[in-house]
């Protein structure tokens, strides 16, 4: 078994959709980034890549490459899953935390879990997502951005 951790943060801006965990969430602001800026999936992808010593998402999906501009992070998560499979690894467990003052994430967490599990070909029970605030402290507390962190375990695939 191997373990990886990931962290990501993006600024909230007007004129962008808010996509977290592959779910479009109604909000007056969205996350700024080269792809769809899905902070949760970025943290999970970094954790998965780290667990198998493949670097990070910046190495594989650089923000200087136009082919990733506006790209769905679910698609990129699928690519990371493919990279794991090529090394004969599969995700055993994902535990992630979204850190956002607003909007509330609770209504969307189950759909996020299903999205992630489906893309990686694992059971929903292997994916846990939590959400918390910073009690009004810092850039997240002021509503300037959203952060996410993830820890994953991966094991050798049997097939």
Swiss-Prot record:
Gene3D superfamilies: 2-C-methyl-D-erythritol 2,4-cyclodiphosphate synthase. It catalyses: 4-CDP-2-C-methyl-D-erythritol 2-phosphate = 2-C-methyl-D-erythritol 2,4-cyclic diphosphate + CMP. GO terms for molecular function: 2-C-methyl-D-erythritol 2,4-cyclodiphosphate synthase activity; metal ion binding. A divalent metal cation binds at residues 8, 10, 42. It comes from the Bacteria. GO terms for biological process: isopentenyl diphosphate biosynthetic process, methylerythritol 4-phosphate pathway; terpenoid biosynthetic process. CDD domains: MECDP_synthase (cd00554). InterPro entries: MECDP_synthase, MECDP_synthase_CS, MECDP_synthase_sf. Pathway: Isoprenoid biosynthesis; isopentenyl diphosphate biosynthesis via DXP pathway; isopentenyl diphosphate from 1-deoxy-D-xylulose 5-phosphate: step 4/6. Its EC number is 4.6.1.12. The record marks 34, 133 as: Transition state stabilizer. 4-CDP-2-C-methyl-D-erythritol 2-phosphate binds at residues 8-10, 34-35, 56-58, 61-65, 100-106, 132-135, 139, 142. Keywords: Isoprene biosynthesis, Lyase, Metal-binding. Transmembrane segments: none annotated. Pfam families: YgbB. Binds 1 divalent metal cation per subunit. Its cofactor is a divalent metal cation. Involved in the biosynthesis of isopentenyl diphosphate (IPP) and dimethylallyl diphosphate (DMAPP), two major building blocks of isoprenoid compounds. Catalyzes the conversion of 4-diphosphocytidyl-2-C-methyl-D-erythritol 2-phosphate (CDP-ME2P) to 2-C-methyl-D-erythritol 2,4-cyclodiphosphate (ME-CPP) with a corresponding release of cytidine 5-monophosphate (CMP). Belongs to the IspF family. Homotrimer. This is 2-C-methyl-D-erythritol 2,4-cyclodiphosphate synthase. The lineage of its organism: Bacteria, Bacillati, Bacillota, Clostridia, Peptostreptococcales.
